[in-house]
Structures are given as C-alpha cells and as structure tokens.
C-alpha cells in the first residue's frame, strides 16, 4: 500500500480503499446479488436491440398495418384488367415501402433526438418536480386532515347520530288502494 494505492484480496490495484463488501464505486454487486437472491441491474445504454422484431411490445399493431387490400378493393362485377391490378398492387407496395424508408432516413434521427429530449424532460420533471410536490402536499395535508377529523368527531358525529335516532322510530306503512 504505497503512494495511495490499495490492493484487494484478489490482487487488484485501486486508488481508493476497499471495504470487505466493496467500495461505493466498485461494489461486489454480482456476488452480493447471488447471495441475496436479488436481480442484477443492467445498464439501459448497453442493451442490445432486436433488428428483426422492431415492435416487441406491439405498439403499432392496429395502426400502421395498412396493406393494398386495406385501401383499394374492387367489388364483384367491377374489376379492372389483371395486369393493371397487379401493377397497382406492386406500385402501391413498393412506393409505400421506399417512401417510408426515405422519410425514416431524412427525419428518423432528428425525430429520435426530439423525442429523446422530450421524454428526458418529462422524466426530469416527474422525478425532480412532480413526485416531490405530491409528497410535500401529502405531508402538509396530513395536518389539515387531523384538524378535519377532530372537527367531524366533535361536531358532525353527534349531530348526525342524534338525527339518526330521531328518524329511527319513523315507520311508513304503504297500502295500495283500489
């Protein structure tokens, strides 16, 4: 241990002292998680993406599945030439496919940037503004709820109990006259 350098039991060199359970920068999370049957935390930034199934949560199942048959249909008795129908199908499908790719290439990254900033702002506001305001409100309202509870038990409970006793002896007899 010379020059502010520390060595752990496995021979690794550190610039900060190592505690038995790990330091705050490099805790023994994996070993501790195995012992305590806890989940390991994975970094969201290093997560691999699936290039085949790009909608694993099926967000756009009912919205964007627009095929040729969903847009253009010829009823019985009103058919165009078969060649025209096939060419229309091919034109529609290829145009939709390549125009989507063109729009994605031009606007995909800027839109991802905009939505990333937007959801970062939403997350920031939720974490640093909304939740603390709600917690603060709940703490402050607790005092008011105690005063309100005392008021109800002191004034309202006896009043409504007395009114209930007054009307408890009221009997209604309904008869049907012919």
From Swiss-Prot:
Modified residues (Phosphoserine): 2, 9
Entry PTM: Phosphorylated at Tyr-14 by ABL1 in response to oxidative stress.
Keywords associated with the record: Acetylation, Cell membrane, Golgi apparatus, Isopeptide bond, Lipoprotein, Membrane, Palmitate, Phosphoprotein, Ubl conjugation
Region feature (Interacts with SPRY1, SPRY2, and SPRY4): 149-160
Region (Interacts with SPRY1, SPRY2, SPRY3 and SPRY4): 131-142, 167-178
InterPro entries found in the cross-reference section: Caveolin, Caveolin_CS
GO molecular function: molecular adaptor activity; oxysterol binding; protein kinase binding; transmembrane transporter binding
Highest taxon in the source lineage: Eukaryota
Lipid-acceptor residues (S-palmitoyl cysteine): 133, 143, 156
Membrane topology reported for the UniProt record: Peripheral membrane protein
GO cellular component: caveola; cytoplasmic vesicle; endosome; Golgi apparatus; Golgi membrane; membrane raft; perinuclear region of cytoplasm
Chain positions covered by the region annotation Required for homooligomerization: 2-94
Predominant cellular place of this UniProt entry's protein: Golgi
Subcellular location: Golgi apparatus membrane; Cell membrane; Membrane, Caveola; Membrane raft
Keyword Ribonucleoprotein belongs to the record: no
Covalent cross-link (Glycyl lysine isopeptide (Lys-Gly) (interchain with G-Cter in ubiquitin)), residues: 5, 26, 30, 39, 47, 57
Modified residues (N-acetylserine): 2
Any one Gene Ontology BP term: T cell costimulation
Chain positions found as Phosphotyrosine: 6, 14, 25
Family per record: Belongs to the caveolin family.
Record-given protein name: Caveolin-1
Protein encoded by which gene: CAV1
């Amino acid at each position: 241990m010379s020059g502010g350098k520390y060595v752990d039991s496995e021979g690794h060199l550190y610039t900060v002292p190592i505690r038995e359970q790990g330091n705050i920068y490099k805790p023994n999370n994996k070993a501790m998680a195995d012992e305590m049957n806890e989940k390991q935390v994975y970094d969201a930034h290093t997560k691999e993406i699936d290039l085949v199934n790009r909608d694993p949560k099926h967000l756009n199942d009912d919205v964007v599945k627009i095929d040729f048959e969903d847009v253009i249909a010829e009823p019985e008795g009103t058919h165009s030439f078969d060649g025209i129908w096939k060419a229309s199908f091919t034109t529609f499908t290829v145009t939709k496919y390549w125009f989507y790719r063109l729009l994605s290439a031009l606007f995909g990254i800027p839109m991802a940037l905009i939505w990333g900033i937007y959801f970062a702002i939403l997350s920031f506001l939720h974490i640093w503004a909304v939740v603390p305001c709600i917690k603060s409100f709940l703490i402050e309202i607790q005092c008011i709820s105690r005063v309100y509870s005392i008021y109800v038990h002191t004034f309202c409970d006896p009043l409504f109990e007395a009114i209930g006793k007054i009307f408890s002896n009221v009997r209604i007899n309904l008869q049907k006259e012919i």
